[in-house]
């Protein structure tokens, strides 16, 4: 079988044909010529329509991979793709890219990989098709060399010689110009369209249902064109339906407007309808829903209804009778006053997580006339109700909607099902979002009403009429929208892309004219020129478009900027004339060009390197030039993408329209309104107003108004005229002089401040919206004027140019550098902040661009690249450089305003003021804080005080410093790193949200990167900056600040004592919190005064003269002596710990060590260096010899990325794990669960999404366990998730353990609940009041209920998916018995089932036992447990628990029954038992390895995966089909045999990739089947747990695969059992206990069982402060008292706690635990 290439005679794919000849030896290709579009038909009858030559190249290269035409590596393929894309951009004209191509080809023979690839073929194809045209322009040397090389290829020669005559004619040079329009007409750029599910040719019906309340915008156009596309593609029907369900919005005028817009889009619907056609039918349907109790009439006010829907509270009218609903419905139909208060709501599900399903409104009463039905109806359906009905009635097969309607799909189908209508298929596509604009009808209307635009067809508007008026062609618009396809990816499209599509349409057809800037032109005197008129083509590539007249003469005009580019003695090419030699450029005294003298040089035809100019001859009659204006537009919104809560009105103050008067070509008089033209070297324009001769009334001609049409380029076209917001050269020069505009800037600054105050005042007073808008608009205009005057944005608190003295010339550059350096630092912080907050990409890109511009400016000023920590050299400051009193007064004033406003906000909140009032006050407060930051450069913090005014100047004695910046910067960076590290640790200890911590970690990493850039070394803990080598003696003449520091210290001490006292007295949280805030404010004040953070050993120090000494000067006897004492004391501490001394002894020694270190810091000013433990100090002192390093287990060698032959680093796949279980357990675990597709992280800390792969494991556990307890007689039920406070606190002992973890619901919307409601941490207190009702007699017992649900425990420990989460799934069983023995038996029966869950399902060994008194369930008699062990961390984990509650709860909740014999009331005996999704985490930790998950066969979602192997390019199609059929048959047989089996038949992944994928997901068995296996009637089974390969005959798979799965399970269980056994140690003395604990073991030790003794064991076995970083620090806790005791307690045995004198009762299992 061969590939059939059908080549188009009109546009033959030359290089595609060459490729076909090349691969024909191994992949036969049959070539057929036709006049149809080029296409490829593959042996399997797949048809690929090739819209370009590149499609042919790609397809053939992939069909013959052995030839490596598409490259060998990913880098090569990427480079080839680049050149393929590049060739497409050259379809119309490649000449602009020849210089780039010449540079690229100069050093190489071929484009990619130094060999012939389809990249060469693609580019050759484009050059060959227009070679004559390029040759006339001049082809660079290297491009010509490469072109000749490709042309000389035998394959190319063969193709060119074998072309049919028709094709040769089409390729002839003479016809190349004629070919361009044809080629444009053939261009087809369709996007990715997905076939509609269930669509049949000729039966598809789609609809476009706009609301007739406005003009269509580009988003509507996409919807209309997509519907039209599918209607045409399937030869179906397109319905144009006006959704006129809201009489208040629809008008007949807008219906006509929309029909006109559709006509412009060339959309011709097959059917026109209105939703109102079906009003009578919908009335009947509404009555039907009411009668069937599927709808009800409701008079809940709108705001309350919204609140109830948010809180999922049912309406009071929901339970009304059908009769009452019908009666109220009649009132609505009449439109009575009573009826107008009601609406009809569908009765769906108020508890649904989907808000659209919470009883939506389907009918409302509106006593308004309808444009079509008049006053016939008083009730109207909602769109959500009408849409599914009309779609069903009109036989719509596919309802196309944007993805924003996805939540309403369930609602749509509910109406269909409830009314038993035909069900259309809903197909979603992404909404079209454009940057720098708004598509909201409400916001667009605001622009029109505010007079900011001319109307709905304003060229700046995204309406269909607006963009068409600006110059968009219907064809360009259609191509752009269709290119988007039916993708569901929501992205913001840049306007450049749509205009780039448009350019491809208009470029071949737009006639060329000339226009010069009227005010900026120069006369050229051309010697030898005569006045004559010539005819030239209006389009250089298409003579069929007509001719234009060009006047030649001795005097001509050119643009001033072009005159500046002329060089005397060189030729310049005057377009449409020829080369002219420039003789003299005449200038006046000030250097401005006045005229140019030149001479004709038409004989010279060398146009390669000449300057190309547009020009106009000087006409005798000035009226020959039509008055012309070029109008340039900018986007209506200055920000690319608006944030969710951002007000678009904040980004509209910029200039969006600019008119430039031009000297127009006389030929422009012929242009008509709507014509699209090109002003040469200026761009494309659309004639908005055509020229009209002088009017008889005014005697003034009507000027030509040309609207600039963007062409998609980001760079300006040379001399393209004044662009919006681009100041001219003179303006720039003026702006550069700070003195000239300082007065204006100062005045503007004052006006902006006043206007800002006015805006804030209006907002705080809740003024009318339009009044605020006017004030804001004026404020934005003032800011724009300020920017024009100063060249920079206005910022709060900045001083204008007039307030600063003009710097001396010698220091101005340095001052500028200082300013730019500060701006760079600030912008860098902003970029890091944006990245930390996960801001949108456009926003980050804009900030990065600004940062790069600042760095470039810095380099220009200083001559060197900017580096982190750089401090530019500045001129010596004068004595008057102290901070001004005025500035300090301003800061003090802002601080007082912040304090007052803060008090106001707190008063409003405490008084329960309405939200709007509070919000206004908060906004004012935030504005004041922003003013504070602008004035001081730092954020406002509680307790901040204004800097004191400078009483006297500071005298600074300055001495030479060889490297001032380096020392200062290193110190600064080290301080920042330390502070940031402290901040992160605080966040982690406070259990802050993951996203918040991640943002701070990123900032810390950035600081460490800056440190490395500055010092060349990695930052390490304990790093100390080198001491400065200069001495700066500073004399402070101010008063002693020591007294202030001392005062604050005493206040801190007193406040700390007060808080500790409150906590010891168990004071309420609301009492303690204000005191803590006061303490924090005092610590902030201490830091302000002393310059360092408060520590417990902080002391008041008198103000002394600080000296920063060199390292030599620091070598003092006091320092040496302290260093020796600290080292000696450190040895004492380590010795005490090594000898297992009592905790009191160790604590005392550690306290001495800390005191010595504090003294060291006091003497030296630096912390004692931990790393190295250096001795005596002093530059030349030798350090103590380091201790002999202890041997550590060898770590796996980290593999570096392999390099290819060229030395480049090859890309590595990120499919597998990048952390190992042995080296980095947390990262490894996180990667296993995410890459194994077990969980997805969620934005609520501690809560996670369980994906299908993990939930299947939970489902397997649930299914097995539920069947087992059902056999025991346990029934299933469900109780509410909410618990009242009174009930929860009934059992004080029970709630004690849960109290800190209980999550409370305190609000309903903005209102406080009357009483807080708890979210269940467990369900005893929820279920037992019901048990008390249900149990009356012994006949009601036993009650044995179980529920599968979720619980919430708001733990403050570090959340870990599965192992420790704030919400988790579990099963909880609650039973009640009359007989205690029966209850006790059930406890152990359930425990046995839990043990089987682990051993039988999860292949994990467990220890069964009873919890100690300290660890048992609160409120129970005793707790039994199964404990598992995770050797990777050396920690145990509680697997499941079964509690005997005794009569504790039955006495509390009065669950009693009457004894049949004594007739007395007796309390029941109760049990509770549960197992959670924690089991999944245990399974992962125990079994998973460094390749990913290892799933036990009994719970694996897929037990065996079938992977076809051995398919190559040489595999025949019938062999491939046979292999796939055999694999599918194998899969079917295994499924029939009870094996959960699937096949991986994806053809876009290699077998190796699939192997890695399924290994990562832990599938127990991989079954490999290849052609050879098929012949041998066998398969290869690969075990995931051991990677062992086993060959199995296909005939025996039904027996051997299940048996092999059982073998795998046993093997995994045995391996885990051996691991657990080897890590379980029996110990009888404390030294062994601590030693084995540190070696990651669990310990069986004799124990007395006392709670106080257990606390002591846990405390004493905890790691000390100086233990290995990163290792678990907690002490050992009791895990359980095993049922299987290792040995009886002997008389000589002692409790494992060395200080305990009690007799041990049993061996207890101890260990570190999760």
UniProtKB/Swiss-Prot annotation:
Disulfide bonds: none annotated. Zn(2+) binds at residues 1648, 1653, 1695. Mg(2+) binds at residue 1438. A motif ('KMSKS' region) lies at residues 438-442. Residues 170-754 are annotated as: Glutamate--tRNA ligase. This is Bifunctional glutamate/proline--tRNA ligase. NCBIfam families: gltX_arch (TIGR00463), proS_fam_I (TIGR00408). The modification Phosphoserine is found at residue 1110. It is an enzyme of class 6 (ligase). ATP binds at residues 1353, 1355, 1364-1365, 1438, 1441, 1476, 1478. Residues 166-191, 718-754, 791-817, 943-962, 1093-1119, 1168-1210 are annotated as: Disordered. InterPro entries: aa-tRNA-synt_IIb, aa-tRNA-synth_I_CS, aa-tRNA-synth_II, aa-tRNA-synth_II/BPL/LPL, Anticodon-bd, Anticodon-bd_dom_sf, Glu-tRNA-synth_arc/euk, Glu/Gln-tRNA-synth. A motif ('HIGH' region) lies at residues 209-220. Residues 744-800, 816-872, 890-946, 969-1025, 1044-1100, 1118-1174 form the WHEP-TRS domain. Residues 1172-1181 have a biased composition (Gly residues). Residues 1207-1714 are annotated as: Proline--tRNA ligase. One of its GO terms (biological process) is prolyl-tRNA aminoacylation. It catalyses: tRNA(Glu) + L-glutamate + ATP = L-glutamyl-tRNA(Glu) + AMP + diphosphate; tRNA(Pro) + L-proline + ATP = L-prolyl-tRNA(Pro) + AMP + diphosphate. L-proline binds at residues 1322-1324, 1353, 1443. One of its GO terms (molecular function) is ATP binding. In the N-terminal section; belongs to the class-I aminoacyl-tRNA synthetase family. Glutamate--tRNA ligase type 2 subfamily. One of its GO terms (cellular component) is cytoplasm. Catalyzes the attachment of both L-glutamate and L-proline to their cognate tRNAs in a two-step reaction where the amino acid is first activated by ATP to form a covalent intermediate with AMP. Subsequently, the activated amino acid is transferred to the acceptor end of the cognate tRNA to form L-glutamyl-tRNA(Glu) and L-prolyl-tRNA(Pro). The lineage of its organism: Eukaryota, Metazoa, Ecdysozoa, Arthropoda, Hexapoda. PROSITE patterns: AA_TRNA_LIGASE_I, AA_TRNA_LIGASE_II, WHEP_TRS_1, WHEP_TRS_2. Component of the multisynthetase complex which is comprised of a bifunctional glutamyl-prolyl-tRNA synthetase, the monospecific isoleucyl, leucyl, glutaminyl, methionyl, lysyl, arginyl, and aspartyl-tRNA synthetases as well as three auxiliary proteins, p18, p48 and p43.
């Amino acid at each position: 079988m061969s590939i059939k290439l059908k080549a188009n005679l009109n546009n033959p794919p030359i290089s595609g044909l060459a490729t076909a000849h090349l691969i024909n030896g191994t992949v036969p290709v049959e070539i057929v010529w036709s006049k149809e579009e080029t296409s490829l038909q593959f042996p399997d009858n797949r048809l690929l329509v090739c819209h370009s030559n590149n499609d042919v190249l790609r397809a053939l290269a992939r069909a013959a991979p052995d030839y490596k035409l598409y490259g060998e590596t990913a880098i090569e393929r990427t480079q080839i793709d680049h050149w393929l894309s590049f060739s497409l951009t050259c379809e119309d004209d490649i000449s602009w890219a020849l210089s780039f191509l010449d540079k690229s080809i100069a050093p190489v023979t071929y484009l990619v990989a130094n060999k012939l690839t389809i990249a060469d073929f693609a580019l050759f194809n484009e050059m060959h098709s227009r070679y004559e045209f390029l040759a006339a322009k001049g082809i660079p040397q290297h491009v010509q060399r490469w072109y000749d090389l490709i042309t000389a290829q035998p394959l190319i020669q063969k193709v060119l010689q074998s072309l049919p005559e028709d094709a040769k004619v089409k390729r002839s040079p003479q016809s190349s110009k004629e070919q361009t329009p044809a080629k444009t007409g053939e261009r087809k750029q369709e996007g990715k369209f997905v076939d509609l599910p269930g669509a049949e040719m000729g039966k598809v019906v789609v609809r476009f249902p706009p609301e007739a309340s406005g003009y269509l915008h580009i988003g509507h156009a996409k919807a209309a064109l997509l519907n039209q596309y599918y209607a045409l593609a399937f030869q179906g029907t397109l319905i144009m339906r006006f959704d006129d369900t809201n009489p208040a919005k629809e008008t007949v005028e807008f219906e006509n407007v929309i029909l006109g817009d559709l006509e412009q889009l060339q959309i011709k619907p097959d059917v026109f309808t209105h939703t109102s056609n079906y009003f009578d039918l919908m009335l009947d349907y509404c009555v039907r829903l009411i009668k069937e109790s599927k709808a009800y009439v409701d008079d809940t006010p709108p705001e309350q209804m919204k609140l109830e829907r948010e809180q999922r509270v049912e309406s009071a009218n929901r339970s009304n009778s059908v009769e009452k609903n019908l009666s109220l419905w009649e009132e609505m139909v009449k439109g009575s006053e009573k009826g107008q208060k009601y609406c009809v709501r569908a009765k769906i599900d108020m508890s649904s997580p989907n808000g659209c399903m919470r009883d939506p409104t389907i009918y409302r009463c509106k006593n308004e006339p309808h444009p079509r039905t008049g006053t016939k109806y008083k009730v109207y359906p909602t769109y959500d109700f009408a849409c599914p009905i009309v779609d069903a009635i009109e036989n719509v097969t596919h309802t196309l909607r944007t993805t924003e309607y996805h939540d309403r799909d369930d609602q749509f189908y509910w109406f269909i099902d409830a009314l038993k209508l035909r069900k259309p298929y809903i197909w979603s596509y992404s909404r079209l979002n454009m940057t720098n604009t708004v598509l909201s009808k409400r916001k667009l209307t605001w622009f029109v009403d505010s007079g900011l635009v001319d109307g709905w067809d304003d060229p700046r508007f995204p309406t269909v009429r607006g963009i068409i008026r600006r110059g968009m062609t219907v064809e360009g618009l259609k191509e752009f929208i269709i290119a988007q396809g039916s993708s569901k990816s929501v992205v913001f499209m840049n306007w450049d892309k749509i205009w780039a599509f448009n350019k491809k349409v208009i470029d071949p057809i737009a006639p060329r004219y000339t226009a010069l800037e009227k005010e900026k032109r120069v006369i050229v005197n051309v010697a030898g020129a005569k006045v004559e008129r010539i005819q030239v083509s209006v389009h250089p590539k298409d003579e069929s478009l007509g001719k234009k007249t060009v006047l030649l003469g001795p005097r001509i005009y050119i643009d001033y900027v072009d005159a500046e580019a002329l060089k005397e003695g060189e030729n310049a090419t005057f377009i449409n004339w020829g080369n002219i030699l420039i003789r003299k450029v005449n200038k006046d005294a000030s250097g401005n060009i006045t005229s140019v003298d030149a001479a004709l040089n038409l004989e010279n035809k060398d146009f390669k390197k000449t300057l190309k100019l547009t020009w106009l001859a000087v006409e005798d009659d000035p009226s020959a030039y039509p008055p012309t204006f070029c109008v340039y537009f900018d986007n209506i919104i200055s920000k690319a993408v608006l944030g969710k809560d951002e007000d678009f009105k904040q980004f509209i103050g910029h200039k969006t329209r600019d008119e430039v008067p031009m000297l127009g070509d006389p030929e422009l008089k012929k242009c008509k309104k709507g014509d699209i033209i090109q002003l040469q070297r200026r761009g494309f324009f659309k004639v908005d107003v055509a020229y009209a001769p002088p009017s008889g009334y005014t005697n003034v001609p009507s000027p030509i108004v040309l609207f600039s049409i963007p062409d998609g380029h980001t760079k300006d076209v040379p001399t393209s005229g004044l662009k919006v917001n681009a100041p001219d050269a003179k303006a720039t020069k003026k702006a550069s002089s700070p003195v000239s505009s300082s007065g204006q800037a100062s005045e503007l600054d004052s006006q902006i401040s006043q206007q800002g105050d006015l805006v804030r005042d209006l907002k705080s007073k809740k003024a009318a919206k339009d009044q605020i808008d006017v004030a804001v608009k004026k404020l934005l205009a003032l800011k724009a004027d300020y920017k024009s005057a100063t060249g920079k944005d206005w910022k709060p608190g900045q001083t204008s140019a007039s307030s600063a003295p003009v710097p001396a010339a010698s220091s101005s550059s340095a001052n500028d550098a200082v300013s730019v350096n500060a701006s760079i630092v600030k912008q860098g912080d902003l970029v890091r902040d944006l990245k930390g907050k996960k801001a949108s990409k456009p926003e980050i890109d804009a900030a990065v661009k600004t940062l790069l511009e600042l760095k470039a400016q810095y380099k220009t000023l200083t001559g060197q690249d900017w580096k982190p920590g750089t401090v530019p050299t500045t001129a010596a400051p004068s004595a008057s450089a102290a901070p001004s009193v005025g500035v300090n007064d301003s800061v003090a004033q802002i601080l007082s305003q912040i304090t007052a406003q803060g008090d106001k906000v707190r008063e409003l909140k405490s008084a329960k003021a309405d939200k709007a009032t509070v919000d206004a006050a908060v906004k004012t407060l935030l504005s004041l804080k922003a003013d504070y930051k602008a004035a001081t450069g730092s954020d406002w913090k509680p307790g901040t005080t204004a800097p004191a005014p400078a009483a006297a100047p500071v005298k600074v004695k300055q001495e030479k410093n060889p490297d001032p910046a380096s020392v200062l910067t290193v110190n600064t960076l080290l301080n920042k790193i330390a502070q940031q590290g402290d901040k992160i640790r605080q966040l982690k200890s406070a259990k802050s949200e993951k996203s918040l911590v991640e943002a701070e970690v990123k900032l810390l990493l950035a600081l460490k990167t800056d440190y490395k850039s500055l010092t060349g070394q990695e930052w390490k803990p304990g790093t100390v900056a080198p001491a400065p080598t200069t001495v700066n003696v500073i004399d402070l003449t101010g008063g002693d600040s020591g007294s202030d520091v001392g005062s604050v210290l005493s206040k801190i001490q007193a406040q700390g004592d007060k808080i500790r006292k409150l906590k010891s007295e168990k004071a309420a949280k609301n009492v303690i919190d204000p005191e803590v805030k006061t303490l924090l404010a005092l610590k902030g004040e201490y830091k302000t005064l002393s310059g360092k953070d408060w520590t417990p050993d902080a002391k008041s120090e008198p103000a002394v003269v600080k000296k920063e000494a060199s390292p030599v000067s620091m070598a003092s006897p006091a320092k040496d002596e302290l260093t020796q004492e600290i080292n000696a004391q450190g040895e004492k501490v380590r010795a005490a710990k090594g000898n297992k001394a009592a905790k009191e002894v160790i604590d005392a020694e550690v306290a001495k060590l800390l005191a010595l270190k504090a003294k060291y810091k006091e003497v030296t000013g630096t912390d004692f260096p931990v790393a190295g433990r250096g001795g005596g100090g002093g530059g030349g002192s030798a350090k103590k010899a380091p201790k002999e390093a202890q041997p550590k287990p060898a770590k796996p060698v980290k593999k570096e990325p392999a390099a290819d032959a060229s030395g480049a680093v090859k890309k590595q796949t990120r499919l597998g794990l990048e952390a190992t279980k042995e080296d980095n357990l947390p990262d490894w675990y996180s990667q296993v669960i995410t890459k194994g597709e077990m969980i997805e992280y969620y934005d609520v800390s501690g809560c996670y999404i369980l994906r299908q792969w993990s939930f299947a494991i939970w489902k397997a556990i649930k299914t097995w366990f539920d069947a087992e307890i059902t056999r025991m007689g346990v029934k299933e039920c469900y109780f509410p998730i909410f618990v009242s406070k009174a009930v929860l606190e009934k059992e004080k002992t029970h709630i004690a353990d849960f109290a800190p973890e209980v999550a409370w619901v305190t609000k309903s919307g903005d209102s406080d609940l009357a009483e807080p409601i708890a979210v269940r941490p467990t369900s005893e207190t929820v279920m037992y009041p019901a048990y008390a009702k249900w149990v009356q007699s012994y006949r009601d017992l036993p009650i044995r209920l179980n529920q599968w649900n979720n619980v919430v425990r708001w733990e403050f420990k570090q959340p870990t998916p599965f192992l420790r989460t704030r919400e988790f799934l579990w099963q909880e069983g609650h039973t009640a018995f009359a007989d205690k023995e029966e209850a006790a038996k059930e406890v152990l029966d359930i425990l046995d089932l839990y043990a089987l869950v682990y051993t039988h399902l999860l292949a994990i060994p467990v220890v069964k036992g009873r919890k100690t008194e300290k660890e048992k369930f609160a409120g129970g008699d005793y707790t039994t447990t199964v404990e598992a062990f995770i050797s990777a961390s050396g920690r145990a984990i509680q697997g499941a628990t079964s509690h005997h509650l005794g009569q504790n709860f039955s006495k509390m909740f009065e669950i009693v029954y009457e004894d049949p014999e004594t007739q007395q009331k007796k309390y029941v005996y109760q049990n509770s038992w549960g197992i959670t999704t924690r089991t999944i985490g245990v399974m992962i930790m125990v079994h998973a390895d460094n390749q990913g998950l290892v799933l036990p066969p009994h719970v694996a979602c897929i037990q065996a995966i079938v992977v076809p192997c051995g398919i190559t390019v040489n595999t025949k199609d019938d062999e491939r089909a046979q292999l796939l059929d055999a694999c599918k048959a194998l899969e079917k047989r295994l499924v029939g045999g009870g094996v959960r089996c699937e096949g991986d038949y994806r053809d876009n992944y290699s077998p190796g990739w699939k192997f890695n994928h399924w290994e990562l997901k832990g599938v127990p068995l991989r079954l490999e089947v290849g052609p050879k296996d098929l012949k041998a009637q066998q398969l290869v089974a690969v075990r995931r747990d051991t990677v062992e390969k086993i060959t199995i005959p296909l005939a025996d798979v039904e027996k051997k695969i299940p048996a092999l799965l059982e073998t795998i399970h046993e093997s995994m269980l045995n391996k885990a059992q051996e691991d657990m056994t080897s890590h379980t140690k029996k110990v009888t003395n404390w030294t062994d206990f601590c030693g084995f604990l540190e070696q990651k073991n669990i310990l069986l030790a004799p124990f007395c069982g006392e709670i106080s003794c257990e606390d002591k064991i846990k405390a004493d076995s905890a790691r000390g402060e100086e233990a290995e970083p990163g290792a678990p620090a907690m002490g050992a806790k009791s895990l359980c008292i095993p049922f299987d005791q290792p040995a009886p307690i002997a008389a000589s045995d002692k409790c494992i706690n060395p200080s305990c004198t009690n007799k041990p009762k049993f061996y207890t299992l101890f260990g570190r635990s999760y």
